[in-house]
């Protein structure tokens, strides 16, 4: 692939972005602009393409930590830090959209948020959305990060965090790296215990979502809450 500087001006990613907008660029080209330069034998666009291939797309890239990015050939602290910052801004933008609306008035937005955050994580993560009495988002947070098989979350810790944020309701979500989004018996038991613990302090558990790849299962929609 020719270097971006060797392309005719109208074909270079930056010039195309400025002329036609960012939507006119492929994902690899947008990543190339963030990376700025390639390495010996690889253009920045090549590196962007390889990142997408390695992580199975943008959602997988979202789940990569800065340390993991730095372990890849040609990605030093500067490039990894820039990518991590851009990905975090995208995550916060998704969170900001939720904060502008009642969280439960657009359940599709909640599912998209958790799918973006969890779909391609290699280990289990458990996340929470903390809501006020009008079901507006107060903040979000990670409750646990575990092994391939499980993330340990204790009801008392969730209750403590909910009280700290003055939440009136919670939405929980975790991922199944195994690939099946169907709730296990352990998921059902955990949800029941969490609902009971939160009820003691008059906080509602509105839903518990399970993410596996492109699938998001709502335990509330299944009648398990």
UniProtKB/Swiss-Prot annotation:
Describe the family membership recorded for this protein in Swiss-Prot or TrEMBL: Belongs to the UPF0758 family.
Q: Does the keyword Metal-binding apply?
A: yes
State the Gene Ontology BP annotations: proteolysis
Give UniProt keywords alphabetically: Hydrolase, Metal-binding, Metalloprotease, Protease, Zinc
Specify the protein name: UPF0758 protein Bpet3149
InterPro entries per UniProt: MPN (IPR037518), RadC_JAB (IPR025657), RuvA_2-like (IPR010994), UPF0758 (IPR001405), UPF0758_CS (IPR020891), UPF0758_N (IPR046778)
Q: Name one GO molecular function term.
A: metallopeptidase activity
Q: Which PROSITE patterns match?
A: MPN, UPF0758
Residues bound to Zn(2+) are: 174, 176, 187
Q: Which residues form the MPN domain?
A: 103-225
Sequence motif JAMM motif, location on chain? 174-187
- Superkingdom of the source? Bacteria
């Amino acid at each position: 692939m020719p270097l971006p500087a060797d392309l005719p001006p109208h074909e270079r990613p930056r010039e195309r972005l400025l002329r036609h907008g960012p939507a006119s660029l492929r994902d690899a080209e947008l990543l190339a602009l963030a990376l700025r330069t390639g390495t010996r034998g690889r253009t920045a666009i090549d590196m962007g393409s390889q990142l997408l291939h390695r992580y199975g797309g943008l959602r997988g890239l979202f789940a990569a930590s800065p340390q993991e990015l730095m372990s890849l050939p040609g990605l030093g602290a500067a490039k990894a830090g820039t990518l991590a910052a851009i990905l975090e801004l995208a995550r916060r933008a998704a969170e900001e959209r939720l904060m502008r609306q009642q969280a439960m008035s657009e359940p599709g937005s909640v599912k998209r948020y958790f799918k973006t955050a969890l779909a391609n994580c290699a280990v289990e993560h458990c996340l929470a959305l903390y809501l006020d009495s009008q079901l507006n988002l107060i903040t979000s947070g990670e409750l646990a990060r575990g092994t391939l098989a499980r993330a340990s979350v204790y009801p008392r810790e969730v209750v403590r965090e909910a009280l700290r944020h003055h939440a009136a309701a919670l939405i929980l979500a975790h991922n199944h790296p195994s690939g099946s989004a169907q709730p296990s018996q352990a998921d059902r038991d955990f949800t029941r215990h969490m609902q009971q613990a939160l009820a003691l302090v008059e906080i509602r558990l509105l839903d518990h979502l399970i993410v596996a790849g492109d699938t998001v299962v709502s335990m509330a929609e299944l009648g398990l809450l």
